[in-house]
Amino acid sequence: MSKIKIALLFGGISGEHIISVRSSAFIFATIDREKYDVCPVYINPNGKFWIPTVSEPIYPDPSGKTEIEFLQEFNKANAIVSPSEPADISQMGFLSAFLGLHGGAGEDGRIQGFLDTLGIPHTGSGVLASSLAMDKYRANILFEAMGIPVAPFLELEKGKTDPRKTLLNLSFSYPVFIKPTLGGSSVNTGMAKTAEEAMTLVDKIFVTDDRVLVQKLVSGTEVSIGVLEKPEGKKRNPFPLVPTEIRPKSEFFDFEAKYTKGASEEITPAPVGDEVTKTLQEYTLRCHEILGCKGYSRTDFIISDGVPYVLETNTLPGMTGTSLIPQQAKALGINMKDVFTWLLEISLS
């Protein structure tokens, strides 16, 4: 049986570039090689595509390497002399693209739309679901409308609202949590106990972003739970996994807590009781379906007084060997090689 040729897109132009490189190392090593020929395509922070020219591409171990060191080793191993134009991947015979990207243009619908234009199927959600999930403000409006608990929130838009006036006259009380509306992986996020602290955070975010989400801080147990879809004939059967409780050693599960070894404790399955687990599974499945996600997703919650409040849904969650979805799949006896096969089969269907 001939193998299906796929591209594994990784790296990218977002602040989560290095996380994508780590995730994709695991993806590359895990995809079923009896079914698929995998070609890793590196996208550098400037958006240049580095496409291997050898018949059996190699993905170097990124551990302990700088971006430059990794790229040099990647290019040497794969006989790459210079970057290609992005559209060149349409001439390489790829039948699908596995998205190992995270955040920014890799997760907000832009790369999805680009691949759609080239006629290359891809894993994960489409343009609309990706952009809606990345837009935390509009996603919250949808979640709230569908009866999923959401902490009080509002949005500040640069040049459109007076942030200082708004922060001094909030309809809900401090402390609040502040993050870029279109951000990911807890980059540039923080807690503010006063309007002045909030303004400092907003000013920092406005340097690089135009929209800021301000949300009432809900204290409680932080959990995250994934959804997978299993292809059955022509249908996709979505089902929830088990929740993971996250206990950061810092005040919040920020970027460092997520991706620094030992910076947080993750317990899978989360010890939150059967009733709360069932509610989390119901809510995460509903979030997945409300946004129109495809293949997989992961939704984060805070449990306060027994009530799970949704924080956000991620359409391209982390996929290192120790990331949350692999943990949750393992707890249910699901092999990640099978998961990646499901994602590719769905993309090709």
Curated annotation (Swiss-Prot):
It is found in: Cytoplasm. Mg(2+) 2 binds at residues 312, 314. Keywords: ATP-binding, Cell shape, Cell wall biogenesis/degradation, Cytoplasm, Ligase, Magnesium, Manganese, Metal-binding, Nucleotide-binding, Peptidoglycan synthesis. InterPro entries: ATP-grasp, ATP_grasp_subdomain_1, D-Ala_lig_Van_CS, D_ala_D_ala, Dala_Dala_lig_C, Dala_Dala_lig_N, PreATP-grasp_dom_sf. GO terms for biological process: cell wall organization; peptidoglycan biosynthetic process; regulation of cell shape. Its cofactor is Mg(2+); Mn(2+). GO terms for molecular function: ATP binding; D-alanine-D-alanine ligase activity; metal ion binding. Pathway: Cell wall biogenesis; peptidoglycan biosynthesis. It holds the Pfam family Dala_Dala_lig_C. Belongs to the D-alanine--D-alanine ligase family. This is D-alanine--D-alanine ligase. The lineage of its organism: Bacteria, Pseudomonadati, Spirochaetota, Spirochaetia, Leptospirales.
